[in-house]
Amino acid sequence: MAAPSNTAAVDQLTSDLANANMNGGEKTTVNTNVGASFTGEEIDTAGPTPSSAAPHPQASASLYVGELDPSVTEAMLFELFSQIGSVASIRVCRDAVTRRSLGYAYVNYNTTADGEKALEELNYTLIKGRPCRIMWSQRDPALRKTGQGNVFIKNLDVAIDNKALHDTFAAFGNILSCKVAQDENGNSKGYGFVHYETDEAASQAIKHVNGMLLNEKKVYVGHHIPKKDRQSKFDEMKANFTNIYVKNINPEVTDDEFRTLFEKYGDVTSSSLARDQETGKSRGFGFVNFTSHEDASKAVQELNEKEFHGQNLYVGRAQKKHEREEELRKSYEAARQEKASKYQGVNLYIKNLDDEVDDEKLRQLFSEFGPITSAKVMRDSITEPGEEGESKEGEESEKNKENKPEEKEGDDSKPEEKEGEDSKSKSKLGKSKGFGFVCFANPDDATKAVAEMNQRMVNNKPLYVALAQRKDVRKNQLEQSIQARNQLRMQQAAAAAGMPQQYMQAPVFYGPGSQPGFMPPAGGRGMPYPQGGMPMQPGRPGQFPAGFAAQQGGRGAMPQGIPPMYGLPGQFPPQGPFPQPNNPQFLAAMQQIQQSALAGGRGGPAGRGPMQGGVPVPGMPGGAGLPGFPPNARQQGPGAGRGAAAGRAPAGAPAGARGAGAPEGLQGQLAAVADNPGQQKQILGEAIFPKIQAIHPELAGKITGMLLEMDNTELVALVENDGALRSKVDEALAVYDDYVRQQGDGEGAQAPSKEEKTEEKA
């Protein structure tokens, strides 16, 4: 809408704001209830929110939708935004590894008029209980980060939300973005931002609203200062401080005595002793403000550590809360890094321990490799019958004592153990959790222990011995492993289906400008991704090409480049009709395929990769399957890779000529790649997986991974001997069940995610 330009309108608004109550009127919302159900109910637009006109440099039909609940999907947004007009594409931006929503999306309309209408009628609409924030998408990061026309407002009442703030400031000019800062619980932090299209509008808003009352609170309105500029000013203030903080003050000291102590160093503008509100007693600290920095600095130098009324004072520059928190964070991080480096390479994590192994037995097992500083077997905490009357402090102390080594697993810290535990303490030990820690004095001894003790049988159980790692390191490794396996499965599925090489492109396309994240437009059927030198079809000005996941700058996330047909390898030859990726129903189906690919692990039905049937793709004739695929191509498991494809024979071939799992065919394949042990391992896995799947289908993938740690010659023998294979499968199941039980006990403080449970290697 056009901004009022006449002075009378602005003056009238100013007078209205003088005693405005932001809760006085009925709050206008568009109650769609999209998150609860897809009823297609008509949107209530009785009181549309004033919005800005489209940016002047170019017409745009692309909208940025922020403040979304993590569970909001493309289908939910399509249900809402399609009521305004024809939607070209919708993309919810997600994390590249976890595929979790980042809380914002992009909606592309076919016409700019529909985009303007959506911005006018749907801004601050409740989606799954949270008001969304809509603005025009700005692809140029330089324009987003200039800060021109950006206004900062503080001392806002907690009842003022995004819409109320927008309504208040919309009269001064076109608003590009409006936001009230919120905490993790959705409560207002008391400040917000309004981004105008022009500096003139921002100046008008500051002139007329700064110092006015909103909900009986006087607000401050000023130009937004970038963080780097604020930091430089803050550093200057720190160097020229006048306010000092004093602590360790005797409670008997009066205000006059406190002020007199500092007045001899210069002119004091104010002094204050902190007192308890109920009793009025001094809390032992206070503040003194001088007129000049030199006087304040002199007082700090001469009074710090000086005795006053029998107590040594602490006198220093007064710090803001965020400064103190930052210093504490840095000191904690430094201590943690020092602790981690101290035990780097010497602390071992041992699991799959027998219940009979105690601390002493664990020490004896590893003592042959060098001096041991500590050895600890983790155990459950127990409560003796006669301990019910113990104090709460005692119970918490015992709990902390038992949990301390468990935290060590995540923090790579040294297990604590007192030497020479008495018999009474031993009698109170709980059941072993099946894992423990051994800390050596020398890294070389620890390395030798890992090499010698890993997989050694102790009480008929193979030990797992490795260097202890912090929790965040293990999590990063697991995420990288999951991503690599999912990519490998997609490539294997494409190869098994006979997909030509030119159709198996990387998921991110780099355009002529070498800028990552640009996706090619939806081409004709059978058209592969453009290669170097091929021009991309220009899109509508201001609108993202279909399948391009735009990234709003400065949000701390990597570019989200997902091809239009993510979950399917490349684009397919023209062997039948195929749905266009712009179709929102197709986007919803592709999202299901993505989730199936990420949720499926080495075992379980979901682990069969994105090519598995069961997820219907809209637009396919009769759900018959993917064009150009053999009828059974989508039903193959993870083993259906290159080796399985090589083992298939034409339909008319004799039965004996088929089956990649036959020993003769297997030996031939192994001989062909004799110089590549990794490829041999892959062939053996493809051959052994169907046999294991017939024995135990639910954990076939996980058991296959466990058995692949064996030597290749042993694996060949297992392929040829079903009895030996079944025996090994039973052993692997026993080890896995024991591992699951130990993990449930040892890491119960934080249950692993579904991906971790499925993908973690036993």
Curated annotation (Swiss-Prot):
Subcellular location: Cytoplasm; Nucleus
BP terms from Gene Ontology: mRNA processing; mRNA transport; regulation of translation
Region named Disordered: 39-58, 376-429, 596-663, 740-762
Pfam families reported in the protein's UniProt record: MLLE, RRM_1
Main localization category: cytoplasm
Role, per record: Binds the poly(A) tail of mRNA. Appears to be an important mediator of the multiple roles of the poly(A) tail in mRNA biogenesis, stability and translation. In the nucleus, involved in both mRNA cleavage and polyadenylation. Is also required for efficient mRNA export to the cytoplasm. Acts in concert with a poly(A)-specific nuclease (PAN) to affect poly(A) tail shortening, which may occur concomitantly with either nucleocytoplasmic mRNA transport or translational initiation.
Name of the protein: Polyadenylate-binding protein, cytoplasmic and nuclear
Organism encoding this protein: Pyricularia oryzae (strain 70-15 / ATCC MYA-4617 / FGSC 8958)
